[in-house]
Amino acid sequence: MSWFTGASLAAGSLVDMAGTISSIVAQQRQIDLMAEANRIQADWVRRQEALQIRGQDISRDLAVNGTAQRVESLVNAGFTPVDARRLAGGTETVSYGLLDRPILQRGILSGITETRHLQAMQGALSAFKNGASYGAPPAPSGFVNPNYQPSPPRLKLGPRPPSTNV
């Protein structure tokens, strides 16, 4: 029976040794998996940091150049530079007479012409009220010239028609 006991003990030792070896292999596999997970996590952290830096760069760029880029894209979309600035938050106005012109694309604006009739009428009324800033200057003091008459100008229409006493 001693050989059976020795064989059983040897088999038990072999099973224990196989269990220890499989445990060591499993632990090594677990270590490899943890190292892979750590590598993936480190890569994820690097990418997140790069995304945050890129986001900060974009925020800074938009804070500095955002309005200019918006205006440029609106001009490229077909708006006039003034209308693009108005759409981007500018306070400029475009008046046709006493009315503010709405924001329109260039294609629509090509059919609208600005006549400036109201400005011409306002200029004429101002000239009647205040006088014109052009023309002959007032006569210098002590200078006598028939072209410098203090009387208002006269309109000569031609010879007088004959008069009759009927």
Swiss-Prot record:
GO cellular component: host cell cytoplasm; viral capsid, decoration
One Pfam family from the record: Calici_MSP
Function noted in UniProt: Minor structural protein that forms a portal-like structure at a unique three-fold axis of symmetry, following binding to the host receptor. The channel formed by VP2 may allow the delivery of the viral genome through the host endosomal membrane.
Cell location: Virion; Host cytoplasm
Region Disordered, residue ranges: 138-166
Main location per the UniProt record: virion
Organism: Sapporo virus (isolate GII/Human/Thailand/Mc10/2000)
Source superkingdom: Viruses
InterPro entries xref list: Minor_structural_calicivir
Keywords on record: Capsid decoration protein, Capsid protein, Host cytoplasm, Virion
Oxidoreductase found in the keyword field: no
Subunit structure: Homooligomer. The portal-like structure consists in 12 copies of VP2. Interacts with capsid protein VP1.
Amino acid composition bias (Pro residues), ranges on this chain: 149-166
Recorded family membership: Belongs to the vesivirus VP2 protein family.
Entry protein name: Minor capsid protein VP2
Upper lineage: Viruses, Riboviria, Orthornavirae, Pisuviricota, Pisoniviricetes
General remark: Translated by a ribosomal termination-reinitiation process from the bicistronic mRNA coding for VP1 and VP2.
UniProt comment concerning the protein's domains: The N-terminus domain points away from the virion surface.
